[in-house]
């Protein structure tokens, strides 16, 4: 059979928003208007280029907040030649894929989940060819995406089936399922079927389709609920999908939303099944607690423009919504730290008006004293214990907004974390809001987690004001503080987080665990908390008869969902905890999370899924991967791959190597190690050597604003002469970009991406292009590699091979700076300090001890130095022969030229 793609292929795209978005390639033509349900519709051809979607179904089963989704689509190719189908998937970041399968010609091709270390081998092979194997990620605010292209045989059909799972989170007093429907093509059988089972009973259920006229929505959306069960069915006919009576385009273009909540007549909602339990805690009819809240706001120069405008708009609205019993203050931090009052004041009408005037009037500063701003806000809240005891029963909250990294005062992230942790001491939660993409979000997440809060990214968009208000609305009404949920110690073998600093109106606390054998019947939960003016205490017992009844009604699904809910929450918590522990404990947590991911068949940041029996033109299997916040996804660059079933695999092809234009004159370090500094302002070059012992690690580039760094470790000759200084060279380089958790370790033997995360290992025999969240690495076979950082610099590592039979010398590396103009003014290091203009004057040129190398007097940094004119080699363009560079040589390890002594640049680690 012919596996070639026809002139036009069908594109079937499935996007998931919170749950799933479905999208297919548009049919020819465009809609001219919305249809009216009363208009008579004509039969139309639903095929595009001989391919039509026979069915597209989303089946969602929810059992006690645990949602299990199966998305099935069948595509039929009626053409006499093969067609290409692209299956694009966007899933919420909170979801775990558990299955993906493709069925064609009676054969099933099933996903196989493995640990990611094993899957890296697949990544490596795909990267070497400069293409992708279904791994390209394009994440939106809450989404993750992958794409699989498949060639479909003529006169045949193919069925895709995706399964994924998640725990629904309660916000604003309801659970919400949003499905964005956008087929752009008429579907013979389109269906969304949502089945809900909640043991507490369903108190409300609604379903809406923003894209349907009200009359048509009433005809096509069927919704019902009674007792424990709820059901929503959306099954429009082909004629009901048409955008106009004679159109072949679809009006299914918008959000399909299902919202529901459960009955809260009983405070206790405790399920026990199959030696696992799930406890849902969301008591009603509690009095809102008064709160003490301090807003800590970044007013550095980078906030100018829309950011500060939107921040002010949000603050004005938030202040207007505060209750008279609340107390508050505002702290602003730039280069300096200033507070509005310096202590908590009541949210009276006069104070709120004055605070709003303060917000309207503040102006921006320059740098970012994040540490100072946070400590000032913490100090204000801590005063409650010392000087305002009447406010000690309020719920205290600290909210910080920043759009960048610390650049003033304390800038070391580990020290800031320690300072904040020691100052808060567990008294109240810290919520960090990271505005835009230039913020170190992992840093904010760790800080929030260490202090009983959470971090949220605010996207730089037209709705940033609403994003800020939306976050505040979630924490605006605390009902309980210090919520402690306890279970019998002799009965519980494993437990998710059971202590929460605060419980807010409209939310829900979920705890799950594993129970020892024979302990189910006596299982109970004790809850203690502090409320407004009173203590909260309750004991929940398992109702055995009710559980038996539930098991009869829902059977295996209830047992299975309670256990998988526990596994889901446990894995999520283990992954989060990894961010704030040392390397040894991180490895232990990773091992636990990996084993659970494999046991329960979840695609998590530690696992990947490949599809057996499916391959592309180079024999690669498609791989489904889930990126994590602390280890961004690897993206292979190049043309997309089209996968075919095992019977249709064409012969392998090879991609061309990647080339990159290099500047005429560069700054770098090479050979023994000779530092070459090009000074464009003088149209001249300086050079110096560093004489140190093998094993020493030197800081070459360090940008404190971004954390970007390059360190190099020296190696010596294989055979060393006693009592003599033998040559040293760079044998290991570490390039790190903490903003994206990027690390690259380079040696003359291997190139390792993210070595701390078990990343892929490439050899110098590979030709590869890889991208990780704004960093592109190009490996040019047996020659060099180029690292390009968005909003940063471009750097080259040159490989030097020596004669294989040499008993003295060994392979080494050179490092060159190709572009540094976007690096910050604070960049330092043996090379980095010269990214900025440097002034010097040369005079009194006269013959030196070597007639071919004149000496001279150089005045630099207010020092007079004796320098020598000489030649060095630049290997950035020609790694084998190099090009001679004439330079002024500064003696004694660059003394007088470099800032401080060369020993100041010795660092303990490669990263």
Swiss-Prot record:
Disulfide bond entries: 244-247, 268-540
Residue(s) carrying Phosphoserine: 129
Subcellular location as annotated: Secreted
Keywords annotated in UniProt: Disulfide bond, Glycoprotein, Phosphoprotein, Protease inhibitor, Proteoglycan, Secreted, Serine protease inhibitor, Signal
Domain named VWFA: residues: 290-450
Protein name: Inter-alpha-trypsin inhibitor heavy chain H1
Residues the record lists as Phosphothreonine modifications: 402, 407
Coiled-coil region list: none
This protein's record includes keyword Disulfide bond: yes
Post-translational modification: Heavy chains are linked to bikunin via chondroitin 4-sulfate esterified to the alpha-carboxyl of the C-terminal aspartate after propeptide cleavage.
CDD domains reported in the protein's UniProt record: vWA_interalpha_trypsin_inhibitor
């Amino acid at each position: 059979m012919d596996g070639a793609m026809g002139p036009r292929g069908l594109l079937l795209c499935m996007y998931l928003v919170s749950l799933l978005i479905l999208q297919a390639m548009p049919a020819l033509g465009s809609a001219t208007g919305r249809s009216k349900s009363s208009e008579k519709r004509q039969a139309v051809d639903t095929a595009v280029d001989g391919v039509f979607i026979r069915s597209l179904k989303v089946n969602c089963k929810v059992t006690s907040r645990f949602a299990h989704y199966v998305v099935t689509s069948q595509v039929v190719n009626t053409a006499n030649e093969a067609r290409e189908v692209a299956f694009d998937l966007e899933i919420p970041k909170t979801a775990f894929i558990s299955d993906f399968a493709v069925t064609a010609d009676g054969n099933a091709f099933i996903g196989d989940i493995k640990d990611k270390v094993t899957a890296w081998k697949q990544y490596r092979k795909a990267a070497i060819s400069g293409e992708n194997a279904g791994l390209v990620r394009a994440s939106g605010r809450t989404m993750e995406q992958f794409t699989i292209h498949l060639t479909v045989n003529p006169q045949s059909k193919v069925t895709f089936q995706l399964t994924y799972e998640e725990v629904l989170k309660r916000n604003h007093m309801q659970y919400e399922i949003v499905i964005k429907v956008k087929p752009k093509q008429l579907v013979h059988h389109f269906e969304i079927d949502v089945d809900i089972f909640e043991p507490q009973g369903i108190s409300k259920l609604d379903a809406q389709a923003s894209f349907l006229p009200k009359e048509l929505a009433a005809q096509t959306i069927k919704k019902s609920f009674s007792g424990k069960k709820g059901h929503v069915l959306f099954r429009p006919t082909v004629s009901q999908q048409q955008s106009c009576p004679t159109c072949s385009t679809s009006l299914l273009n918008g959000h399909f939303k299902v919202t529901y909540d459960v009955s809260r007549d009983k405070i206790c909602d405790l399920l026990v099944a199959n030696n696992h339990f799930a406890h849902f805690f969301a008591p009603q009819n509690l009095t809102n607690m008064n709160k003490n809240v301090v807003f800590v706001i970044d007013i550095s120069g980078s906030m100018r423009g829309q950011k500060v405008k939107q921040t002010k708009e949000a603050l004005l609205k938030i202040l207007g919504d505060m209750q008279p019993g609340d107390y508050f203050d505002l702290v602003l931090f730039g280069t300096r730290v200033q507070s509005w009052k310096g202590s908590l004041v009541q949210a009276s009408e006069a104070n709120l008006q004055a605070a709003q005037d303060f917000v309207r009037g503040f102006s921006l500063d320059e740098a970012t004293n994040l540490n100072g701003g946070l400590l000032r806000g913490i100090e204000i809240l801590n005063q409650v214990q010392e000087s305002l005891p009447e406010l000690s029963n309020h719920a205290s909250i600290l909210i910080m907004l920043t759009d960048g990294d610390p650049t003033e005062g304390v800038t070391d992230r580990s020290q800031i974390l320690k300072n904040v942790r020691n100052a808060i001491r567990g008294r109240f939660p810290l919520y960090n809001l990271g505005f835009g993409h230039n913020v170190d979000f992992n840093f904010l997440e760790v800080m929030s987690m260490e202090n009983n809060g959470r971090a949220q990214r605010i996207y730089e968009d037209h709705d940033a004001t609403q994003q800020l208000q939306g976050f505040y609305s979630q924490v605006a009404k605390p009902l309980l503080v210090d919520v402690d949920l306890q279970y019998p110690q002799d009965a519980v073998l494993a437990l998710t987080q059971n202590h929460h600093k605060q419980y807010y109106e409209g939310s829900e606390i979920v705890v799950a665990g594993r129970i020892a054998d024979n302990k189910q019947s006596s299982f109970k939960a004790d809850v203690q908390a502090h409320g407004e003016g009173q203590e909260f205490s309750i004991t929940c017992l398992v109702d055995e008869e009710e559980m038996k009844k539930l098991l009869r009604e829902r059977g295996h699904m209830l047992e299975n969902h309670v256990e998988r809910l526990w596994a889901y929450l446990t894995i999520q918590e283990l992954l989060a905890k990894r961010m704030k522990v040392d390397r040894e404990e991180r490895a232990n947590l990773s091992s636990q999370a990996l084993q659970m991911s494999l046991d329960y068949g979840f695609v998590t940041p530690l696992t990947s899924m490949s599809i057996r029996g499916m391959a592309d033109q180079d024999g690669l299997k498609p791989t489904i991967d889930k990126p994590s916040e602390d280890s961004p996804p690897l993206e292979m660059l190049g043309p997309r791959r089209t996968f075919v079933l095992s019977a249709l695999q064409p012969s392998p092809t090879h991609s061309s190597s990647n080339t990159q234009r290099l500047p005429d004159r560069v700054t770098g370090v090479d050979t023994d190690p000779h530092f070459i500094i090009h000074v464009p302002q003088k149209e001249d070059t300086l050079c110096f050597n560093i004489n140190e012992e093998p094993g020493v690690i030197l800081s070459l580039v360090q940008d404190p604003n971004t954390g970007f760094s390059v360190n190099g470790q020296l190696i010596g000759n294989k055979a060393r002469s006693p009592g003599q200084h033998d040559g040293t060279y760079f044998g290991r380089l570490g390039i790190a970009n903490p903003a994206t958790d990027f690390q690259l370790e380079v040696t003359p033997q291997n190139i390792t991406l993210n070595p701390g995360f078990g990343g892929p290992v490439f050899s110098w025999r590979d030709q590869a292009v890889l991208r990780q969240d704004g960093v592109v690495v190009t490996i040019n076979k047996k020659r060099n590699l180029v690292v390009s950082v968005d909003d940063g610099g471009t750097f080259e590592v040159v490989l030097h091979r020596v004669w294989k039979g040499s008993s003295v010398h060994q392979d080494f590396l050179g490092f060159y700076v190709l572009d540094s103009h976007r690096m910050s003014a604070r960049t330092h290091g043996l090379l980095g300090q010269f990214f900025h203009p440097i002034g010097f004057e040369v005079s009194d040129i006269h013959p030196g001890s070597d007639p071919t190398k004149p000496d001279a007097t150089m005045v630099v940094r207010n020092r007079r130095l004796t320098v020598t004119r000489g030649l060095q080699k630049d290997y950035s363009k020609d790694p084998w022969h190099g090009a001679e560079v004439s330079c002024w040589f500064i003696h004694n390890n660059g003394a007088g030229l470099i800032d401080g002594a060369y020993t100041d640049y010795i660092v303990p680690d490669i990263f």
